[in-house]
Amino acid sequence: MTHRRDTVQMEQRWTNARLATMAGDDLGLIDDGVVAAKDGRIIYAGPAKDAPATQGAVHDCEGRLITPGLIDCHTHLIHGGNRANEWAMRLEGASYDEIARAGGGIVSTMRATRDASEAELVASALPRLDALIAEGVTTIEIKSGYGLSTNDELKMLRAARALANIRAIRVEPTFLGAHALPPEYQGDSDAYIDLVVGEMIPAVASLATAVDAFCEGIGFSPEQCARVLAAAKAHGLKVKLHAEQLSALHGSALAARHGALSADHLEHATDEDVRAMAEAGSVAVLLPGAYYFMRETRLPPVQAMRRHGTRIALATDNNPGTSPTSSLLLMLNMGATLFGLTVIEALRGVTVNAAAALGLSAEIGTIEVGKACDLAIWDVGDPAELVYRIGFNPLHQRIKDGQ
């Protein structure tokens, strides 16, 4: 098939590159590839021999690998304080459940977050965000969930949005009011869910793009989470769910019934849960950092996900208690080493499938015409190197919206 080589006014053009477009079912590799963009959108991605001529700026990539900009689709980046002391307790034998029931865990971060101003939350989050940006991340999801009051949850979401005005990154704010029970509602979780559903969700609807909940024995019941998801959808918000991290409550199947973008963690998900997610199109977001940091032993059912065709994404789960990491590249290696993902599965997990987990498949996640020109240019030629290496950042350049 021949292609007409029209002259197009292009703002930017990257040539002499090996492209991993992520289009199709694999890495979408194109040798001697070209990416061209205008007004922040990709207008050509393919072989150099078929590329239209241009009068715009041309950047010779000298054989480097270009992937879509990476996407961290599950983080708790905004928070006050840290929980290094609880980590020390865990090293001495305390369980996550014991720490939480003793007033630690999420509630201890709640206190520090409530005490912090919006400006302080932004300032403390910036180093964590910058570490992810330095690894080629161009889109990040940031959850609330450490305020646990209407005003403090709003403060967290405003802080998350503020980051996008300070750095060149797309931020997807998620409301996670049903993260833990605040002390003032101790013993009356239904009343707190009443607050989440009746007051918080209407208040945050203009700031958040999605709503999440923590479906666990130390969190909220499936019935309570169902109320949260239903209220979110009634306000036009996308939904997702923390599910099956510590126990099998079939939260992932619940998420699927509500048309959730994703269910996340999933170490205790059953075959039926995974099948329900596949049928609903919900993405399985795996979080190897939390698995590693908590010394978990039960693996998420990756083979069942493959068998049923459930899409798999990877994320840092950046948070102060169970995954204090700001390295998505490390998650690539952990996803492969701990969970048995292939190179293709891992890389698609931080690009095309991560975009699906945020409901942004039409915008980002692949290098295709019409999508945002979010790229990561790497000082490697083989995509496997991004998954293989540990403590090594080969990022050459990060491109956000063509710049």
UniProtKB/Swiss-Prot annotation:
The gene is hutI. The keyword Zinc applies. It comes from Sphingopyxis alaskensis (strain DSM 13593 / LMG 18877 / RB2256). It is an enzyme of class 3 (hydrolase). Binds 1 zinc or iron ion per subunit. Keywords: Cytoplasm, Histidine metabolism, Hydrolase, Iron, Metal-binding, Zinc. Its cofactor is Zn(2+); Fe(3+). This is Imidazolonepropionase. The keyword Cytoplasm applies. InterPro entries: Amidohydro-rel, HutI, Metal-dep_hydrolase_composite, Metal_Hydrolase. Its main location: cytoplasm. It is found in: Cytoplasm. Disulfide bonds: none annotated. SUPFAM superfamilies: Composite domain of metallo-dependent hydrolases (SSF51338), Metallo-dependent hydrolases (SSF51556). One of its GO terms (molecular function) is zinc ion binding.
